[in-house]
Amino acid sequence: MSKKYYFIGIKGTGMGPLAQILHDQGNEVLGSDIDTYTYTQAPLEAAGIKILTFDARNIDANQDAIFVRGNAFNNDQIEVARALEIGVTMVSYPEAVQEQISQTTSIAVAGAHGKTSTTGLLAHVLKNIAPTSYLIGDGTGRGVPNSQFFVVEADEYRRHFKDYAPDYAILTNIDFDHPDYYTGIEDVTSAFADFANNVKKAIFAWGDDEHLRSLKPSADVYYYGVNPERDDFVATNIHKSTQGSHFDVVFRGKDLGEFAVPLFGQHGILNALAVIAVSYMEEVDLDLIRQYLLTYQGVKRRFSEKQIADITVIDDYAHHPTEITATLDAARQKYPNKKIIAIFQPHTFSRVIAYKDEFASSLEAADQVYLANIFGSAREQAGTITSKDLGSEISKFGGIIEENDMSLLMPYENAVMVFMGAGDIEKYEFAYEKLLGQLRTDLT
């Protein structure tokens, strides 16, 4: 029997995909959000899902719906406040997700870094082999009736993943992030320990992460990595090229054969190894895993590429030093003979304060670095540090860019321009691409 759902904050990177899933299942779905365009709304519009502007009257007009409340909203948000006032049925986003994943064999992917890419890769492989629903943090979701698998990205921010109880979990790493909420690495590790204790069947964890190794869940734990002395699933005979990476996989002494992925950087190999591991333990055919790893084309805003004349533009969500290192490493592998230019928009003042030295160190891997002004958040509009302060710590710092002035970036030819950030870095990228396209057209 179909139901009606109303999403408060439907453009959220998790809310949007969940709305798509419920719509795909034949439910009536609508929701509200800000008017500003976001990349997550395109699939909602394509599905014909109605998007309203936040207004308390929306709650009154849809009292017959189940309201799904986005994680970003407090009780004083205009629609949340009205929903609480009149007593309609309202559930949190994690509660709504858990309701969905409880109906099938569920695999949650969690980690400070790499969870979206790994979720996307796992969803791609499984959906081509068996009926699979998935919810990815790039704004992509798909609901398949009578799914065999449900793949979900599990976010550690504010312990949102504590409500999930999946059959399996992939844990890519534990790192100190979100300093506006977590007090330190011990606090983050505690959150992951609580999540791991909810997993029913097995956990697949990166073996080089000592924080992950410190977890003691009741479920079986399989470690993946490149260390045959410590890991259960091991990638060996690794070869990296400008076309991607290929490697052999060994599970506790058993040779599972060679695999190849069109991915770049060491993190791409580890993500693929995690996908191979969980799929193998669910007895998915190895040849099918091999086949569909090769056809993976990535997820939104994770090393997304486009070519404009002689310039390669890469768009990536990297907003933590570890992620910046991984993204620039991938760019070096794929384009070893080109200049790598980093254009980075720091995300939140608290994160820049906490990681100023680490940001500077990670960005040094580029040939030249440009910064946009710090992007604040709804909870953090100002701070005591600036992008210029960060730039002063970077030896290859080229200056601060503005949306209406791309002159610093225009002299580069036959280069790789890597735009990174979790805020609105895309507006700088679009401004650059527009001007670059005009200039290159004028020269032809």
From Swiss-Prot:
The keyword Transport does not apply. SUPFAM superfamilies: MurCD N-terminal domain, MurD-like peptide ligases, catalytic domain, MurD-like peptide ligases, peptide-binding domain. One of its GO terms (biological process) is cell division. It comes from Leuconostoc mesenteroides subsp. mesenteroides (strain ATCC 8293 / DSM 20343 / BCRC 11652 / CCM 1803 / JCM 6124 / NCDO 523 / NBRC 100496 / NCIMB 8023 / NCTC 12954 / NRRL B-1118 / 37Y). GO terms for cellular component: cytoplasm. PANTHER family: UDP-N-ACETYLMURAMATE--L-ALANINE LIGASE, UDP-N-ACETYLMURAMATE--L-ALANINE LIGASE-RELATED. NCBIfam families: murC. It is found in: Cytoplasm. Keywords: ATP-binding, Cell cycle, Cell division, Cell shape, Cell wall biogenesis/degradation, Cytoplasm, Ligase, Nucleotide-binding, Peptidoglycan synthesis. This is UDP-N-acetylmuramate--L-alanine ligase. Its main location: cytoplasm. It catalyses: UDP-N-acetyl-alpha-D-muramate + L-alanine + ATP = UDP-N-acetyl-alpha-D-muramoyl-L-alanine + ADP + phosphate + H(+). Coiled coil: none annotated. It comes from the Bacteria. One of its GO terms (molecular function) is ATP binding. Belongs to the MurCDEF family. Its EC number is 6.3.2.8. Pathway: Cell wall biogenesis; peptidoglycan biosynthesis. ATP binds at G111, A112, H113, G114, K115, T116, S117. Cell wall formation.
